[in-house]
Amino acid sequence: MGDGDEFAIDVKDEFIVCVNYLASPYGSSSPVTSDPKKVDGKTYAADFPTPITIRDNVRVQRKLCDRLGIKHLKMAIGGSMGSMLALEWAATYPDFVTELVLIAGCGRHTDWAIGMGEAQRFSIMADAKFKGGEYDPADPPRAGLATSRMMAMLSYRAPKSVDQRFNRDVMEEVEEASATSK
């Protein structure tokens, strides 16, 4: 995406709408938003209404399109969870979007992917600083989040990809060469 014919999506010719997810702190109410019902100014934290679904996000995006006067989407593009949103666009509003570009996504999670997601969630919840979701924003559960992200990064790659990226064989050769040069 860029300005010019060499880009797959030329921003001179296309109107791009990029919408953040519901409950993300970057543009909508989220668990870190101040809860108006709490007199002490504390955030929603664990009291934030859940769950929020892919379909909920698409419905809000459609309302935004209506508000902007957009009558049709030429293309819905998304990576990972964004590809699930694009698929939901096609399922919920089939006459509203013409084309889909799905990057690293799926229409349905496998049992393995659901299990990985739960393990990641539990690693955050097991962090002593999580405190049932009522953690101190100045001292969040970083260790649990770091563990969750490590698990996620591994789950995004096939074993061969990890082997190529970290290439333990090369490291063993370096260690052997270092040991023989002493």
Regions found by a protein language model. Give the residues of each.
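Gly/Pro-rich cap/lid or specificity-loop segments adjacent to the active site
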Residues: 1-84, 91, 95-107, 112-118
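Alpha/beta-hydrolase-fold enzymes
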Residues: 96, 102-182
